[in-house]
Structure formats: structure tokens, C-alpha cells
Amino acid sequence: MSFSPLIRQLIDAFRVLPGVGQKTAQRMALQLLERDRSGGSRLALALGQAMDGVGHCRSCRTLTEEELCPQCADPRRDDTLLCVVEGPTDVYAVEQTGYRGRYFVLKGHLSPLDGLGPEAIGIPQLMERISQQGTFTEVILATNPTVEGEATAHYIAQLLHEKGLVASRIAHGVPLGGELDLVDGGTLAHSFAGRKPIAL
């Protein structure tokens, strides 16, 4: 079926979302145009406001509308623990466990084949944050339990070891090859309780 230029543009816009293919994008676009124009208007408004108003926390780099996210602005958090995650969705997953320390959000994981080295994902900024803060006694590496996540954790652990800092890895109650934001809170809490130092 051939769509008009504006409908094609809307379909292509939906396809930028993860997991949305051609057919799903068509269904979404046609649903909004045929049956829910007010929903489409709300979506456009919310998307525009979020794109303009949401940035990154200057401390941990998660998504927020403020200079500091709620976790970084909270003075009751434990300043001796730093949890390193791959992305903002992982912060929300870890929060479900009752973790009360600080965070640092990488921009993904090391992936040399995709051209993502330490600088691209923010490892120099992580090391700078650790040096500047000076209060962390343990850095919890909560990268995803994938090959790339494990490589990223090992790389960071080596850097921390050179500075005499303790690095721990969340236990593997999280399924291998899984994503943190898809794991239930109980499993993730168990993984945190069973974390162990990384042997180098």
C-alpha cells in the first residue's frame, strides 16, 4: 500500500522506537489518524515538552528536568556507595531494590565493533566523579550481564583496582543475556544482596 507523504513521515517517525517495525508503526500511525486524534495531539505535545525540557543530571547523568535528579539531590543517600549502570532505565530498576547509594550512568557499554570505546560511554567522567567525590568506598558495577556488559565491568574494575578502590559486581540472579530494566524487583534485590568483589 502506498501512503501519502505525511502519513509515510509519521510511520517513519514511529520506527525510531526500539522494537517498532514497519507493521507496528503503520498500525500506530493509522490508529492515531483514524481513531484517536486527541491522543495524537497529547502525544505530540508530551513528546515536544520532554525533548525540550529533559536533560541529564550534572552529577550522575540520568535523565531529569532539573540540574540534579531526585537521587543526587537527596542528602540522605549513602555517599560511600556508587552504582554504575548502562542507562537511565537501569537506575529505575535498581531503585526498586531499596538501594540507597549514589549512581553514575554510562552511555551504554563497551563495543569496539560499534566504535564505542571508554570515552564514548563516559568512563573518563566516571573516574573523574570518583576522584572528585572522594567518599566512595565501594563501586558496584551493575552493567547488564551480557558479553559487552561483562567486558565493561571488567575494564572499569581494572581502573578502580589501580586506584586501590573496591569494585563489586552484582550477583548473577539476573539472567545471563538479560536487561536490568526487564528484571523483577525481587530478583534484582537478590542479585544486589549477593554481589561479590571482582577478582583481578
Swiss-Prot record:
Q: Which residues form the Toprim domain?
A: 80-175
A Gene Ontology molecular function term for this protein is:
zinc ion binding
Single Gene Ontology BP annotation: DNA repair
Name the UniProt key words of this record, in alphabetical order: DNA damage, DNA recombination, DNA repair, Metal-binding, Zinc, Zinc-finger
Where are the annotated C4-type zinc-finger regions? 57-72
Task of the protein:
May play a role in DNA repair. It seems to be involved in an RecBC-independent recombinational process of DNA repair. It may act with RecF and RecO.
Tell me the HAMAP family matching this sequence.
RecR
Family per record: Belongs to the RecR family.
The name of this protein is Recombination protein RecR
Q: Which organism is it from?
A: Pseudomonas savastanoi pv. phaseolicola (strain 1448A / Race 6) (Pseudomonas syringae pv. phaseolicola (strain 1448A / Race 6))
Gene that encodes the chain: recR
